[in-house]
Amino acid sequence: MGTNSYSLKMYNPGSSQRIVFLGIITSVVIIFLIRLFYVQVINESYSVSATNNVLRYITDYPARGMIYDRKGKIVAFNQAVYDLMVIPKQVKEIDTLEFCKLLDISKESFIDKMNKATSFSRMKASTFEKQISAESFASFQEKLYKFQGFYVQPRTLRKYPNNTAAHVLGYIGEVNDELIAKNPYYRIGDYIGISGIEQSYELELRGQRGVRIVMVDVFNREKGSYKGGIYDTIAIAGQNLVATLDADLQSYGELLLQNKIGSVVAIEPQTGEILAMISSPSYDPNLLVGRVRSKNYGYLLKDENKPLFNRAMQAYYPPGSTFKLTNALAALQEGIIGINTSYPHSFVVGSKSIKCHPHPPIALEGAIQYSCNPYFCNTFRSFVDNRKYGSSENGYRLWREYQMSFGVGKKIGVDMPHELKGLIPTVEFYDKYYGKGRWKASTIYSLGIGQGELGINPMQMANIICIIANKGYYYTPHVIKQIGKYPNTTRNLGERHYTKVSAENFTIIQDGMQRVVEAGTARIARFDSLVICGKTGTAQNPHGKDHSLFVAFAPRDNPKIAIAVMVENAGFGATWAAPIASLMMEKYLKDSVKRHDLEERMLKGYLLPLQNKSLENPGLKVKDSTSVKPKNKKDSSVALLNKKKK
């Protein structure tokens, strides 16, 4: 068999022909694909260039979602403006004098803006002039063809038609480099909500931007979409929001607080919907819109009256006598006091005596009616120093837990930015300050009447009144009830938050609050035959005149509104806070106000320092926190006045 292995192979001429044939077919296909690419891409690009057309990528900014009040009234909408864009490489010789005249800018400004645009990119578009109004754009548009390399970018800006609710609605501003680095969605020139609803609901309001590719001729005129718009993306408008606010009530409350410093928060107890949230002094939200936004923001920021400061959620105040209600509720639940527990008109601590107006021993309902300091100082002492807890530290720790169940000393989850939790000191705080085992209720007794080291904001005060109105629970206070066509379900708003106090213990508290309005310290708050439950307060202020406080809800049997009013440096709660709250409740429940004399007195009231009368935006330099430390280690209540706190 010695045949060579190569002899087994046979020559087949057909195989070689097949390879040649396949090679020809492959070459034809490759040539066809190259030609197709040339015809569809390169040749079209040459065609665009040959006719002096260029491609321009234009961002389509979505319309920001509108905001309505609870009755369907628009409180925030959009108006058209135009940004003038520039691509430096495409700019040819232009008549800069005419250009500057049309835009009402100087030649120096023109040069500066061009240098900035070139520094950013010679090839990419950047903003040359922001937010040109529709009126100015109309005259400029006719001559835009003369200025090659420039084009107009349509967009919208906010408009707030009622000129109110600045702290609730918030404002928007341009994103900065830091924000862009954190969130890849945003690009240079985008706007974002910075405060209020605009910030909290940015994702729902902003929508989704789109991009159009258009052809532009040598005369700077758009000649239509590139390739029929197949590469365009459509902008998606933001979702509309329905707020819980009553715009009329909000405006009325702002009017009543004019020339005063303070806050009002009104909530619907049965839902947690915020009906009004007012911080005074305030500002017109339209000041922070448009080309003058930066200038106006600088003015507001430097204003010593701090109009940008949201006192409703960020200011700490001693709650004063309004805090007696939660003090009593904790003691009732623990069996420390009963509805018939009585106490005389004097409370003695060492050599000090805290007195009320002379009266025989009174029970809880009467103590609430007459705001008896000795009664509630004793209630606090009886709780904290009670032997069944083993020590004053344990008693105070439990008392503090009760207060926190009312939303004190913690964030209650409002759907607004910058909520502060307030202040209610811990056992560790007092141990550190006085020394462990060296303090007891008599050292910090002023907490029992809402003084001392307490700091609560008006939102928390209003929420406490919702709890009392509901007999033991609250819904998370919120400002948005509907997103698009659907209820707001983003924050479990329908969930009830219960306190540590049983429902039956609230009846006696409501009885006492009703007597406050009908025959006690807040008779001025009565109107019609409506049953109102309220409590006045006069909170000591270490920096000046006492603060005026009033909290209330109405009607008693079917609460529709709970309200907290704080007027700084205004004295007794019945003088200013109670009338303002009463007028707002009347406005909301009756839709009109009949007590015109009282209304006129509140409107004319000027409670600001005389030296500020000349200011455009009058107000008072706010104290960011009234959570003062004890004045000495012997007695944190040394400043407590021997007078009845109304």
Residue ranges and their predicted role:
Residues 1-294, 316, 395-405, 446-448, ...:
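Periplasmic/cell-envelope proteins involved in peptidoglycan metabolism and beta-lactam response
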Residues 2-8, 118, 217-222, 226-230, ...:
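Beta-lactam-recognizing serine transpeptidase/beta-lactamase-like catalytic domain environment
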